[in-house]
Amino acid sequence: MNVNEIIKGPILTEKSYQLMSSGVYSFKVSPKTNRSETKKAVEYIFNVKVEKVNIFTVPKKEKKLGKSKGFTTKYKKALVKLMPGYTINLFEDESPQDQKDSETVSENTEEKAKIAKKKAELEAKNKEIAEKLAKKQAELAKKDSETNENQEKRIENQTENQENSAN
């Protein structure tokens, strides 16, 4: 069996995290594999020394979803104990991640400064626009009052003309 086909993936649960601190790692493995193949595969893939391998089959479990019933699939689980001094890093290397985080923090502060500057510029433009609108509204109100006065004068002139023509 091919080394890459033996290990299907890590099993990451609360219990497996506790076991990792003592050097025991849990993997989902191919149902056709045995202890020696699993040991060779882990040593080859992760470049570590294996002390002990325990393999067992996890049985299928009944699951219910509403009215329907079903089963989870059974799988083979391997608990691999490493020699002292060896560890397997199942996650990304954390040190480059810390550098990325610090870079993103500095980028975020620069972006926040740019955003604050743009907000200030927009507020200044909004104030200018508000002042212009206020001036235009004042001019329109003045024109409206003038037109109202002119209309009143026309109406008065028309009524006077009608009275004069009636006399």
Swiss-Prot record:
Region Unknown, as annotated, extends over 119-167
Write out the ranges of the annotated region (Disordered): 91-112, 136-167
A molecular function GO annotation: structural constituent of ribosome
GO biological process terms on file:
translation
Task: Work out whether the entry's keyword set contains RNA-binding.
Answer: yes
rRNA-binding as a keyword of this entry, yes or no, is yes
Q: Which family does it belong to?
A: Belongs to the universal ribosomal protein uL23 family.
Q: What is this protein called?
A: Large ribosomal subunit protein uL23
